[in-house]
């Protein structure tokens, strides 16, 4: 499901003209390039298409149209699925491990399918994450199951690490260790991480590439700094916000002490000293973008 594409001389994950219909839902004309060496956050409201996109990257479903390429490999070519699997670590929403086997047994069972699986690394991560290698996978909590699958994914020495909503079931203490592990994984500079999430604040400080989906459509794909340059939150007295160019306003709503709007940035930091201009957080952007067309002004 991929083709060879280069960005700055480096191979990457690439989707071109991808469409996928699942019942009434449709992923529409998605074209993205995720460079090697980046931590990419895939964001969007529930049912925006994040999991469908990840399944196509993993070869678990195929696009109706378009191509998906990983490291120059296309799933349609003979043996490519095995080669892609060998360089891809997966931490899915659904459970992949056998509930009746211990964590150690699961590692030995599934590790056979990866040429670089290292049991000693798997054991090190299980210990770091506070998991007993002898316990059956089915006896773990939801958060512990994700930790176990995360430990296994890391033990296969992947080039691409793909995680679907991993932090939703983590306790607060582990979330920091999770971020530390991701940063350690990236130290070589030749790997990439894709994290699908609708819980945004804890990932903001490590992400350097962003893909935002809304109702199956691609809203933004690019580096995080370009995203921060592109949009602004403007707050102030309602009549002053109404003076902004209407075509720049994505969504605005009246609040108790004025109006708050998400706008396309065209130098609004210099517009009026009475207006407060800030860079939107991902959470603010998602909130306002999901309500576009409902502006109160």
Predicted segments with their positions:
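C-terminal coupling/interaction segments
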Residues: 8, 249-297
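Conserved ABC transporter NBD signature motif
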Residues: 66-77, 83-84
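The feature captures the beta-strand-to-loop junction immediately N-terminal to the Walker
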Residues: 43-45
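Catalytic Walker B motif of ABC-type/P-loop ATPase nucleotide-binding domains
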Residues: 161-165
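ABC-family P-loop ATPase nucleotide-binding domains
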Residues: 90-148
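Helix-to-loop junction immediately C-terminal to a conserved catalytic motif
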Residues: 58
């Amino acid at each position: 499901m991929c083709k060879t594409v280069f960005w700055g001389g480096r191979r990457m994950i690439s989707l071109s003209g991808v469409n996928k219909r699942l019942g009434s839902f449709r992923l529409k004309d998605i074209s993205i390039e995720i460079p090697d060496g980046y931590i990419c956050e895939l964001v969007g409201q529930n049912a925006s298409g994040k999991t469908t996109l990840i399944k196509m990257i993993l070869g678990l479903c195929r696009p109706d149209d378009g191509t998906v390429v990983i490291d120059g490999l296309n799933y349609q070519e003979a043996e490519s699925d095995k080669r892609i699997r060998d360089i891809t670590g997966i931490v899915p929403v659904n459970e992949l491990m056998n509930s009746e086997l211990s964590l150690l047994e699961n590692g030995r069972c599934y590790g056979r399918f990866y040429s670089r699986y290292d049991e000693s690394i798997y054991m090190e991560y299980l210990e770091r994450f506070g998991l007993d290698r002898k316990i059956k996978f089915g006896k773990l909590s939801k958060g512990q199951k994700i930790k176990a699958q995360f430990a296994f994914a890391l033990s296969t020495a992947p080039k691409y690490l793909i995680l679907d909503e991993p932090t939703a079931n983590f306790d607060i203490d582990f979330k920091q260790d999770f971020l530390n592990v991701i940063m350690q994984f990236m130290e070589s500079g030749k790997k990439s991480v894709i994290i699908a999430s609708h819980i945004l604040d804890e990932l903001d400080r490590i992400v350097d590439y962003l893909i935002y989906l809304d109702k199956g459509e691609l809203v933004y794909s690019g580096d995080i700094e370009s995203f921060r340059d592109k949009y602004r939150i403007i707050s102030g007295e309602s009549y002053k916000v109404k003076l902004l160019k209407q075509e720049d306003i994505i969504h605005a709503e009246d609040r108790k002490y004025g109006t708050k709007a998400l706008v396309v940035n065209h130098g609004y930091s210099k517009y009026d000293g009475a207006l407060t201009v800030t860079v939107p957080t991902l959470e603010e952007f998602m909130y306002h973008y999901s309500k576009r067309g409902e502006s109160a002004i």
